[in-house]
Regions:
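N-terminal Rossmann-fold cofactor-binding loop
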Residues: 11, 174-176, 236
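Short, Asp-centered acidic motifs that coordinate Mg2+ and/or phosphate
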Residues: 48-49, 71, 203, 231, ...
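Short glycine-/small-residue-rich Rossmann-like dinucleotide-binding loops
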Residues: 55, 77, 202, 208-210, ...
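Residue-level detector of alpha-helix initiation sites
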Residues: 57, 78-81, 96, 100, ...
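Phosphate-binding beta-alpha-beta segment of Rossmann-like dinucleotide-binding domains, i.e.
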Residues: 90, 98-146, 158-161, 165, ...
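Rossmann-like dinucleotide-binding domain for NAD(H)/NADP(H)
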Residues: 94-95, 220, 229-325
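Rossmann-like dinucleotide/phosphate-binding beta-alpha-beta segment
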Residues: 135-228
Length: 325
């Protein structure tokens, strides 16, 4: 294997794209490597490409120790686990997969919407427990309800398109879009202030990157502005929602329920403040985990890692790195 450029994969990233890389490069894969920082540092010493998902914390310290590193490939959308500034200063390209799992996430959102609106998980548990409580599980239709999309990017846009098929009214808040933006005009969304979005939404779907502005955005004050009949769904980043504030809002009946694919801490452990609520549905960060989506995600990141190692520009990149000397 000597003489080949080395690629390290520190999490469970598999697929035809990785198999193609293995034919060209020295690919070292350990799905648990992210758990041991010392072993990870050692593995990156002579590595030119590094592929991760969302568990590996690619810190400035880790980057500083990887002198040969040229590209970090994030198999997925969010890259808040990567110190992009440090990578840029070190001349390292950060590539990602910005829309390859968008359909899967949008479909998961509607799975949560329908499960909440029709109380499907509770009804299922009741019947399996010997019950037949039809009155308890009266639901509500999506037709004619108002969907609020917080972040009308590649995923939020696809959620809005599906909402049209359900006959929903669509509101959106996105600081980067105007009323003439393609995502707005094609989805039929009306851009509104965040306060209007919170106040008028029957279903609120969150699609925000994690940064200092969005961290904790959905807190006690935000929940106080929502309808008591409204449902919250978050498939973006757990830290956008303040979990204890959400629990209090649910306890006080300020909102009707929540579907969360992401939490502030993942995995959350055996005890969590939201476990006791029947009107909360939790999934283990699986919104983008379909066979179809993951094949596309891995194919995209593998393509860009290969391009950078071949001296070509990445097609899907986060940063503009300072050229290495």
């Amino acid at each position: 294997m000597s003489g080949k450029k080395k690629i390290v994969i520190s999490e469970d990233v598999t697929g035809s794209g990785i198999e193609r890389l293995k034919k060209i490069y020295d690919v070292r894969t350990d799905p648990d490597l992210w758990k041991n920082i010392l072993q990870l540092k050692a593995a990156l010493k002579d590595c030119e490409a590094f592929i991760v998902r969302n568990q590996t914390k690619v810190t400035a310290e880790l980057i500083a120790d990887a002198a040969l590193l040229r590209v970090i490939g994030r198999a997925g959308v969010g890259y808040d686990n990567i110190d992009v500034d440090a990578a840029s200063k070190a001349g390292i390209v950060v590539a990602f997969s910005p829309e390859e799992n968008a359909v899967s996430v949008a479909e998961h959102v509607f799975g949560l919407f329908l499960s909440l609106a029709r109380k499907i998980p509770g009804a299922d548990r009741s019947v399996k427990g010997g019950g037949w409580e039809r009155k308890k599980y009266h639901g509500t239709e999506l037709l004619g309800k108002t969907l609020g999309v917080l972040g009308l990017g590649k995923i939020g846009y696809r959620v809005a398109l599906r909402a049209k098929a359900f006959g929903m009214r669509i509101l959106a808040h996105d600081a980067f879009l105007s009323s003439t933006s393609l995502h707005v005009t094609e989805s039929g969304a009306t851009l509104v202030s965040i306060d209007t979005l919170l106040a008028e939404s029957d279903f609120l779907s969150v699609h925000l990157p994690l940064n200092e502005k969005t961290r904790g955005m959905l807190n006690r004050e935000a929940f106080a502005k929502m309808k008591p009949t409204a449902f919250l769904v978050n498939t973006s980043r757990g830290e956008v929602v303040v979990g204890k504030d959400l629990a209090q809002a649910l306890k006080e009946g300020r909102i009707a329920g929540a579907g969360l694919d992401v939490l502030e801490k993942e995995p959350p452990g055996k005890e969590h403040v939201l476990y006791r609520f029947e009107n909360v549905i939790l999934t283990p960060h699986t919104a983008g985990l379909t066979y179809e989506a993951q094949e596309k995600v891995v194919e995209a990141v593998a393509e860009d890692v290969d391009r950078v190692l071949q001296g070509l520009p990445a097609l899907r990149f986060v940063n503009f790195p300072i050229p290495k000397k």
